[in-house]
Regions:
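C-terminal target-recognition/interaction regions appended to catalytic cores
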Residues: 1, 214-323
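Class I SAM-dependent methyltransferase "Motif I" SAM/SAH-binding loop
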Residues: 18-21
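A short, Lys/Arg-enriched amphipathic alpha-helix followed by its capping loop at the start of a domain
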Residues: 27-34, 52
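Conserved SAM/SAH-binding beta-strand->alpha-helix loop
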Residues: 42
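Conserved SAM-binding loop
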Residues: 49
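Conserved SAM-binding strand-loop segment of SAM-dependent methyltransferases
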Residues: 55-62
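Class I S-adenosyl-L-methionine
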Residues: 66-76, 84-248
Length: 323
């Protein structure tokens, strides 16, 4: 008889760290996981997050102030953490660094070491691998392996794995304590991109998104001439992107200016709206955007994840655990 108890007789409980507006949580909940704790440093995210999740509301706190004793029981740790330099020799010094220079990754390691979850998924920018000549990524891998975890890591592009019209490369690091689980785990297969950004556009958007009466209009009107392309303003010139695909949405969209991608529609030249950006990140229309400043929404969405990619990874994690 199969001695391994069915690990999914109850939903696996997850810790949602650096949670932002809950994109990772959304993907994992779609795959049947249950969130028991959510944390982020940014209080602006709380309005958006809490409006979309019934339980486990966002706890706004510096992760350094969260004590492991206060965390609920959980099985799986999720974190889309910032990419930072390591000014320290490694994990132990990072732990013992009381001056707050400690890298935020070490806060994740601290929780993993104390609570020893079944596994984790960490998400980061693709540059993590080359950051500081590869040193940063090596310390992260070494630290996680020293804590007893087996790892697989891969860069996935949202337009290849999430059926999203966005050129967004992110690295996903999966770890399991049990080696048989990591052997069974595979990253998702590539999917054909059937969604073009035209399909996610709203047919009517408020006047404020249009450039037609703005000073920049004269400088961009000749270049922005194809309804099937997404453009970016690059301080002095317009850059066009591959047909039907949007450039990476980033947090600096919230800085205003012209960081938000630009398109041509029947009414003229305009930037994408926050709702359109959330769709390009794979958020369902049932996900509610609160009535807060557009700049805050752009930043939150750009900082978030491609929900459909996360969901595919979460399904494969689940499959590895029940296989």
């Amino acid at each position: 008889a199969n001695k391994i108890p069915n690990i999914f007789s109850k939903p696996l409980r997850t810790l949602d760290l650096f949670a932002g507006i809950g994109g990772i949580r959304l993907g994992f909940e779609k795959a049947g996981f249950q969130t028991v704790f959510s944390n982020d440093f940014d209080k602006n995210c709380k309005t958006t997050y809490d409006q979309n999740f019934e339980n486990s509301k966002l706890i706004v706190e510096d992760i350094k102030n969260i004590s492991v004793e206060d965390l609920p029981e959980f099985d799986f740790l999720l974190a889309g953490f910032p990419c930072q330099s390591f000014s320290i020799a490694g994990y132990r010094e990072g732990f013992d660094d009381k001056k707050g220079r400690g890298n935020l990754f070490f806060e994740i390691a601290r929780i993993i070491e104390a609570r020893k979850p079944i596994g984790f998924m960490l998400e980061n920018v693709k540059n993590l691998m080359s950051h500081d000549n590869g040193n940063t990524f090596n310390i992260i891998k070494q630290t996680l392996q020293d804590l007893g975890y087996h790892l697989k890591a891969r860069v996935l592009n949202s337009m290849e794995y999430g059926n999203l019209p966005q050129n967004r490369e992110r690295i996903y690091i999966i770890g399991f304590k049990n080696e048989s689980y990591i052997n069974k785990f595979t990253f998702p297969e590539k999917k054909r991109l059937t969604k073009s950004f035209r399909q996610i556009l709203l047919s009517k958007v408020p006047e404020k998104y249009y450039y037609n009466n703005k000073p920049l209009y004269a400088r961009i009107k000749d270049s922005v001439n194809d309804k099937n392309k997404v453009y970016q303003w690059r301080r002095k010139y317009v850059r066009e992107n591959k047909k039907g695909v949007c450039p990476t949405l980033t947090a600096n969209m919230g800085m205003g200016g012209h960081n938000v991608p630009i398109i041509l529609d029947n009414q003229g030249i305009r930037k994408l709206t926050p709702l359109e950006c959330s769709r390009i990140q794979g958020f369902p229309d049932s996900y509610k955007l609160p009535n807060i400043a557009d700049s805050a929404l752009y930043k939150q969405i750009g900082n978030s994840v491609s929900v459909t990619v996360i969901e595919e990874i979460a399904k494969n994690i689940k499959a590895a655990l029940v296989a």
